[in-house]
């Protein structure tokens, strides 16, 4: 009888004003209710049993779910930083949305407020605006659909070709692979640049720093490397293909546009993704862009493919991070950078790896770029990144203006793991070249003080001048590895010692044309064998000797 009592109690509690009673509240028998007396009369007529069943049905069928959304309010806004009160359960690096539609990322989680960096123009936000959580850590689209596209740091297309069609998304701040999934670097990553492939070889899965002052050709090395991959990506062997991601941080829009045009003209955009956070973009986007590009590259790595990512340049990312940290009131350290600026770069570059076969056998190779001030490699950020990476290519302004391009300082440039990945053919011809060039630079400094030099020193100087000339290379003209081997062979075996240094470049051009047109089988053998056999050595010797005999510069 409990249900009957409940029904009677509800009837007694009905509001006296008829307008407050819903038509559907207690069934069709209450539609005409006007006051408490009328409702009691109808209740007696309908019967308490029927009333209780209607009430039970209504109670059981009620939807008790509540859609709760955690929101906060903007306490202050300025310089791209919003202080938000009320987001008590927000996660670190979670995406939040302002009432204006702008997105931001929570970075400082403090007891009474949250420090949010704004992805865009903070003039659209004002004090008191509502901020809501999205529940998602910052992520970007990844996949083959991004190839050939130019996107911003959040993965939105900015090339005017419509939205990116990828349905797969990946968090930007993923943890680097551990020790067990990795394997040592063992496959070569050909740049097509003689000086790099012979002296500082790079392997797939390596991190090789490109460092130098402004206007010394750092970006040119990176772009040449991308263009050189066309010869592998045009083939059918998936294991040889190398997908490229170029991350432009803090550069001019015109520079990025020229770069995209250059890659398009070279037919290299079809296997390249360009991630752009230009100088006019907000500092949080410049900070985020390298991580976004890295996630796109990791998609290929984790699917058994090979990828190359270029960060151009990480100095500007560090400056953007310093700006954000100081505005978030984090304590400054050396050169006003925050204490975790080393971790900023180490957690990014550690994600480049060569995976073992049980994890797909893919790789992600990183070429970070750092700009120095007046050649000072002992500054804070350069020393940090040098200690993280597996070697560096050091470019010098002095060499650049002497016409030695690429302007690589052989003495300071090193590859710590790349020699294991270098092809045997290149090792055979370039094994002693780095030592000879380093000795030449050392002796050349003393040679200008006097001319009384012994024959061995004069021979060293003579060979060094010719090898330096031989390693010069034009921009956007990468060479296949077998062509490099043929040219360097002529230099290190002493066939060019009697040729005037000024005629070396002309010799190289004519010799390459001759070998490519007349001796394609020899180049094919070097390419397929990966080494110079005795037959190939004898053939090369014969070709060089005969060509020099009839060479007229």
Curated annotation (Swiss-Prot):
<feature type="modified residue" description="N6-succinyllysine; alternate">
    <location>
        <position position="539"/>
    </location>
</feature>
<dbReference type="InterPro" id="IPR020003">
    <property type="entry name" value="ATPase_a/bsu_AS"/>
</dbReference>
<dbReference type="InterPro" id="IPR027417">
    <property type="entry name" value="P-loop_NTPase"/>
</dbReference>
<keyword id="KW-0325">Glycoprotein</keyword>
<feature type="modified residue" description="N6-acetyllysine; alternate">
    <location>
        <position position="230"/>
    </location>
</feature>
<feature type="modified residue" description="N6-acetyllysine">
    <location>
        <position position="434"/>
    </location>
</feature>
<keyword id="KW-0479">Metal-binding</keyword>
<dbReference type="GO" id="GO:0009986">
    <property type="term" value="C:cell surface"/>
</dbReference>
<dbReference type="GO" id="GO:0042776">
    <property type="term" value="P:proton motive force-driven mitochondrial ATP synthesis"/>
</dbReference>
<feature type="modified residue" description="N6-acetyllysine; alternate">
    <location>
        <position position="506"/>
    </location>
</feature>
<feature type="modified residue" description="N6-succinyllysine; alternate">
    <location>
        <position position="239"/>
    </location>
</feature>
<feature type="modified residue" description="Phosphoserine">
    <location>
        <position position="106"/>
    </location>
</feature>
<feature type="modified residue" description="Phosphothreonine">
    <location>
        <position position="134"/>
    </location>
</feature>
<feature type="modified residue" description="Phosphoserine; alternate">
    <location>
        <position position="76"/>
    </location>
</feature>
<feature type="modified residue" description="N6-succinyllysine; alternate">
    <location>
        <position position="531"/>
    </location>
</feature>
<dbReference type="InterPro" id="IPR005294">
    <property type="entry name" value="ATP_synth_F1_asu"/>
</dbReference>
<keyword id="KW-0460">Magnesium</keyword>
<dbReference type="GO" id="GO:0005524">
    <property type="term" value="F:ATP binding"/>
</dbReference>
<feature type="modified residue" description="N6-acetyllysine">
    <location>
        <position position="123"/>
    </location>
</feature>
<dbReference type="GO" id="GO:0045259">
    <property type="term" value="C:proton-transporting ATP synthase complex"/>
</dbReference>
<feature type="modified residue" description="N6-succinyllysine; alternate">
    <location>
        <position position="230"/>
    </location>
</feature>
<keyword id="KW-0813">Transport</keyword>
<feature type="modified residue" description="Phosphoserine">
    <location>
        <position position="53"/>
    </location>
</feature>
<feature type="binding site">
    <location>
        <position position="473"/>
    </location>
    <ligand>
        <name>ATP</name>
    </ligand>
</feature>
<keyword id="KW-0406">Ion transport</keyword>
<feature type="modified residue" description="N6-succinyllysine; alternate">
    <location>
        <position position="506"/>
    </location>
</feature>
<feature type="modified residue" description="N6-acetyllysine; alternate">
    <location>
        <position position="531"/>
    </location>
</feature>
<feature type="binding site">
    <location>
        <position position="218"/>
    </location>
    <ligand>
        <name>ATP</name>
    </ligand>
</feature>
<dbReference type="GO" id="GO:0042288">
    <property type="term" value="F:MHC class I protein binding"/>
</dbReference>
<dbReference type="InterPro" id="IPR004100">
    <property type="entry name" value="ATPase_F1/V1/A1_a/bsu_N"/>
</dbReference>
<dbReference type="Pfam" id="PF00306">
    <property type="entry name" value="ATP-synt_ab_C"/>
</dbReference>
<keyword id="KW-0809">Transit peptide</keyword>
<dbReference type="GO" id="GO:0016020">
    <property type="term" value="C:membrane"/>
</dbReference>
<protein>
    <recommendedName>
        <fullName>ATP synthase F(1) complex subunit alpha, mitochondrial</fullName>
    </recommendedName>
</protein>
<dbReference type="GO" id="GO:0006629">
    <property type="term" value="P:lipid metabolic process"/>
</dbReference>
<keyword id="KW-0066">ATP synthesis</keyword>
<feature type="binding site">
    <location>
        <position position="219"/>
    </location>
    <ligand>
        <name>ATP</name>
    </ligand>
</feature>
<feature type="modified residue" description="N6-acetyllysine; alternate">
    <location>
        <position position="498"/>
    </location>
</feature>
<dbReference type="GO" id="GO:0043531">
    <property type="term" value="F:ADP binding"/>
</dbReference>
<feature type="modified residue" description="N6-succinyllysine; alternate">
    <location>
        <position position="261"/>
    </location>
</feature>
<dbReference type="GO" id="GO:0045121">
    <property type="term" value="C:membrane raft"/>
</dbReference>
<feature type="modified residue" description="N6-succinyllysine; alternate">
    <location>
        <position position="305"/>
    </location>
</feature>
